Amino acid sequence: MTRWRLDIAYDGANFSGWATQPDRRTVQGELETWIPRVLRLDQPTPLTVAGRTDAGVHARGQVAHVDLPDNVDTSAMLRRLSRVLTPDIVVTSVRPVPSTFDARFSALWRRYVYRLWDESSRPDPVTRFHVAPVRGHLDLDCLNTAGTSLLGLRDFAAFCKHREGATTIRTLLDCHAERLDDPCGTVEVTVRADAFCHSMVRSLVGALTAVASGRRSQDWLDNVAASTSRASSVLVMPACGLTLEEVGYPSDEDLARRAAQARSRRSHNDICDTCWGTDEPIQPRRPFPHPLLHHPRGTHPHPHYHRQRLG
């Protein structure tokens, strides 16, 4: 058997997330159904993925690995998958990797982009189901200052949905926003970390946009970030604006070491003031109705729109 890396892109609108669920359409479910069929295998082909995206979240740079027979014809595999998979999911490449490669644990970082329209934007009806509205005008200098204050190794419990036994300690490597030079004036918030907790990116963006729109202060964000439990005041942004863009990996020689490091559960003992980028310890609504996204409950064409927690 050989380990193969799959690079995958999908529009998450009509998927109940990545992970297989009974009686739900998921990305993992579709791929694990069709891969053995197109390869004419009589055994299952379980996939391990870099990021288990939630319902409605998109991906351009998702990565998974799977163990398959040595003689797989990758060109034929890609061609057959393109015929049987629906247009909202594409396997963009398949290539052999060392047996030490683990799509989840070997990853150095994941990069997500959240796309927004504020009141300074001109919404585009063609892309409206991949961009989320936010109330007010966003001061991007303020947003970037707030994002910088969160960088480093820390407990992101305030921004994560609790999962029993899971750590919420992460290293945030990059968090910045820019307004695109496009007709819409779309705002892109880039968030990159070694790993993410459940709903962490959408919660971070919700908190940052609250500060950037003037509805919350930097002191509020500092107090939220210092909390060791979920903050109810933080808005979880809709899934439709979020896309997994890229996953970074080390060289082949460092794959095993990185996987072992990632499997080690981190604790608060790993967190120090210097990691947080400061010499001093940190002391402890609903969106506006958007003309293109306003539909009576149950009539919105985006299947997951009304499932999002909006406040």
State the predicted function of each range.
Residues 277-284, 290-291, 302-303:
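Intrinsically disordered, low-complexity segments enriched in serine/threonine/proline/glycine
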Residues 1-277, 288:
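Structured-RNA-binding interfaces characteristic of tRNA pseudouridine synthases
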Residues 293, 297-310:
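Short, intrinsically disordered C-terminal tails of secreted or membrane-associated proteins
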